């Protein structure tokens, strides 16, 4: 049913939540965004503007379902998933492989990005070979990618300032 409605399915996230709720792990504060909310969030961000070639980030990715929801509606973007839980990172990698997403998955606390634990590049050769792939990300690649994300955020912030000159400036 979900595949018909949304064109994506997160079996790993559903299984993880079912198992963790039985073990009392909800005390850790881990709840995945419901599928219909992921779809709604993506729909709320839609404009007539082209949505390809962008870098889309989820700093608390869980099983990657918000990125999956974005991917099925906006193909051709680079997805960056981050989570402090290694199991969640591994589920996101699997989901990205299954759904043909290109990007990276970073295992770290996104509130302390200098503490890189691990990372993976997902499907970077998919467009050339048609074969899904995963490879370990080096810490140097992580730092380069992180700097790119920070630069993009600065540019977007500046663009917002220019669009709203009579409004209070963003910090």
What is each of the regions a protein language model found here?
Residues 95-98, 102, 106-171:
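S-adenosylmethionine
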Residues 24-33:
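Class I SAM-dependent methyltransferase Rossmann-like catalytic core
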Residues 1-21:
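Long recognition/docking surfaces used for binding and targeting
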Residues 23-24, 76:
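Short, functionally important structural connectors and interaction interfaces within domains
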Residues 18-23, 44, 48:
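A short secondary-structure junction motif
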Residues 3-4, 29-30, 80:
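Conserved aromatic-histidine-acidic binding/catalytic patches
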Residues 34-122:
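Conserved S-adenosyl-L-methionine
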